[in-house]
Amino acid sequence: FTNDGGVFLTTDGGTTFTDKNNNMVTTQFYSTAIHPSSDYVIGGTQDNGTWRISTSGKQIGTEVVGGDGGFTHIDQSNSNYQFTATTYNRVYKSSNGGNSWSLYHDVQASDGTDAGFFINPSVLDANNKAFYASFDATTIFRQKDYTSLTAHDFINVNLGSLASAFKVSPHTDGVLFVGTAGGRVFKITDAHTSSYSVSEISPSSTSAYISSIDVGKDDNQILITLSNYGIESVYETVGGGGSNGWTAVEGDLPDMPIRWGLYNRNNFNQV
């Protein structure tokens, strides 16, 4: 039989199983994070944990956290700080370059149930050492200083649905862009502080799941992708969104969900 680990055989009615993958790799990676100055990579995999690959070339990786592997991050200014998650808001952290890992947060809703998505979107703001993750339709989970064990808190914002995509501005300190499962887009300034402010910059005609956000040559150039069928799946604004408008730029892509979109850093006219 087959599952998310590959192909297996039982000849005794399920008492024992034999791995029949024959070195075939079937693992699905939800995410990867790349070290800023080496060949080191970590990645979260579907039901197969978070794995570390330390050098280039063909090799066997090392599992660093078990269970499901979710979104992974490496601080690009201090690679000692690395993060992964299993499910929901169960976040693991390494403070020594990935040599050891421990549970950093396991944050649940007030009624004790899991909050966020099963594979939960998150993002790092390395400049301000802040960590953000989806939580519920009215709040975003926030860790203001992930270099310490300070208590987490939340950004209060009426999202209308769960946050499904994040992007920290590469241009303006403390600016966080947020997309939602209901097709809305928000810009949060000073997101790492207690005096943050929120503005909605959503397109007027979208209600599908926003799967990614990217920022172009400045904070006014924003790209979003949507994940559904029968819709325009790629939108761009060059005026900051909201009343300044968004343009569908899907072109002749087939009618299928778009999972991620990125600008060409050498030519912001290309996606």
Explain the meaning of each model-derived region:
Residues 1-271:
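Beta-propeller blade termini and top-face loops
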